[in-house]
Amino acid sequence: VLLQDFEIEFIIPIFMLAIGIGAYIGLEPIARVNNMFMPLAGIVLLLSLILLIPYFNINNIFPILGNGVYSITVKGINTISLFSDILLLNILLPYCENTSEAKKSGWRAIYISATIGVVILLSYCLIYPYPVSREFMIPVYQLSRVIHLGNFFSRFEVIFQFVWSILVLIYSSIYVYALCYVWQITFDLKYYKPLILPVVIISGIVAVLPSSVVDLVKSERLENIIVYPVAFLLPILFGFYSKKIYNKRTVNEES
């Protein structure tokens, strides 16, 4: 709805410029903007869920397990990217002065995010019957299109798109910052800011590579199958290896 008359080649550079500025100003300003904007996003989400209640149909959630436990547990591994933000929390942990408080905040964020995700998924399943509910992209946007308050107010998705755009900018800025930070410590660089421009340019080029929604879905599924399992497995392996080295050093020092 927003900027629908503009070409994607015009919209993406604007987004990438805003993301680059966010990554350049640093983590603390991004966190402050996030703290100011999150209450508004929460109010919009809560209002959306309340307005969706008249459209709920309890019969739509059946069958509860869909195609069975196997499809949920084994085939559900393809959606492991939903938990990729946990890796980001570990990357940003060194910025926290109080590690114990940071861990509590991290767990709190995971619980809140999980609760919101369950509520959104439940609302989606209560509105869209099975098997239509199996295939969805940006479910909150699809839910917002259902809301109609008479002829006067029938485009609630406009509000969602505004809030979603700001959240994407904040989210992407944090990831670009984290990526540049990881490269900084990996290659022992003095500053991370010179890395922002090439990262933003490469990200913008990759964003325009899919020629259609079908290609985008295919690339996303490929990432979920190959990239994210490796991304989760490597920290676990390095963790076990580091613990083994630490225990060996402790034994040598004691002996």
Show the residue positions of the predicted features.
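Membrane helical hairpin/interfacial module
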Residues: 1-9, 14-18
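Helix-loop-helix connectors at the membrane interface of multi-pass transporters/channels
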Residues: 1-6, 97-116, 175-199
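Membrane-interface loop-to-helix entry segments
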Residues: 9-10, 22-51, 223-234
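Hydrophobic, membrane-embedded alpha-helices of multi-pass small-molecule transporters
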Residues: 11-16, 24, 51-55, 64-116, ...
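Selective recognition of specific alpha-helical transmembrane segments in multi-pass small-molecule
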Residues: 19-20, 39-53, 107-133, 194-210
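Hydrophobic alpha-helical segments and their helix-loop junctions in multi-pass secondary transporters
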Residues: 20-23, 40-65, 125, 237-250
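Membrane-interface interhelical connector segments
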Residues: 127-157
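Extracellular/periplasmic helix-loop-helix junctions in multi-pass membrane proteins
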Residues: 188-193, 208-228
